Amino acid sequence: MAIESGFDLKAKANKPIVDFLANQKVLIVDAFSASRNTLRKIMTELGVKSANLEITDSFGDAEPKLLGIQPTFVMADYVFNKKSAFELFEITKSQFPNRLDTIFIVTADAETPLLLNRIEDEEIDGLFARPFTYASLQRRVIEIIRSKLTPSPYYRTLCDGRARMTLGKIEEAMLEFVKARNLDPNPVLAWCHEGYARLKLKHIEAAELCFKESLKLEPKNYKGLAGLLECYLVRQKFEDAYNVSRCIVAEHAVRPRRLPGLIRAAVMCGRFDDVLQFYDFYMKLDEVDDTLINSISAGLLVCSKYQMKRGDQAAAAITLRKAMIACKGKAIYLKEILASMILNGMSDEIVSVLASAPNEVKNSEEIRMAELNYQIQAGTSPGRLVEMAMDIIKSGIRNTKLYEVIISGSIKMKRRPQIIEEIVNEACKAFPEHAKTFKGYLAA
């Protein structure tokens, strides 16, 4: 039936929709006044009571409203000052695990491939891209409501299974997904959700078979490919994982939460050009979490070490600069990056970075030892190396290499045997398990 902009509350055909909305609590979260007004008008015309309609232009207001009034119908703007509708969606899911009990719609400025894929991945009810017309928007809202009112047995069973997954009842969820397989001629989602349930239960080989079954039905379906990638990574079948990751990249916009797995597959297979491509993608993201920061930073560091090993110092320098940007100032990566820069002779960058680095980084063992190793490789005089090693020990850092540098340097400087023996004794006291190595310098 065609639906025009005028919605007749009294029409018999519309009674199920009117009844559905009569007691729904609705929350509209949108930064644009024109969008808010259009959405408000639509919901009012569809019969939502004013007392049940909450509207805000602020994410800060939206979160407490979600927690307080617990709306069952939410329309939320995609991005709010680096906050997103998906954060609100997670709250809604925690309150109402069964997706049949709620409607969640995202509004956005554009239907980008990445956003469309995220909507599909999360199985959100709809995406409305601005500018939208009143008639088209109302039509879509009614279509979504009708789909909730008359779900197929297949969709209802999937929702029951997903609700159990959200509640942590994994085995019960798996049984629902197995049941759903027989309720549709093309049960791609049932196979995929069963696969993820089996992954949670650590039934990795069984999960792998589920994802492969979904791919037989739909060879390029994202959930099946992403699940299969996860299985291969867990089983350390890295070449297979890499091949699946290439298929994901070729056929789909990469989801940020899947990027760590793609990076790991590329690193483990030595496909470092891919890691650099993932960095370019990473830099375009509005939101990144710690897992993603850690993955791309570690991946770039491994890539730079590979480049240095093959003698491509220029490429390594570029990669290290990228790692410096990607790590977002995290000390654990800054230390390694700076240490690699020192070994790569990137003196200009080192001075610049150290000037703004926190003391935790500047005075870390990784940086001090990297500086010493660089001076050793550069052929610095034994006297200067001994001086550097002694300064590092005085700073509280303990490392067997420091004592070896002091002992070997002192021998080269032809210091008095008594002094050298005292240094060896001190080294043996600090690291008794390495006494044989230290005393070996005296024998030589």
Per-region residue spans from a language model:
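Conserved phosphotransfer microenvironments
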Residues: 59, 72-94, 100, 349
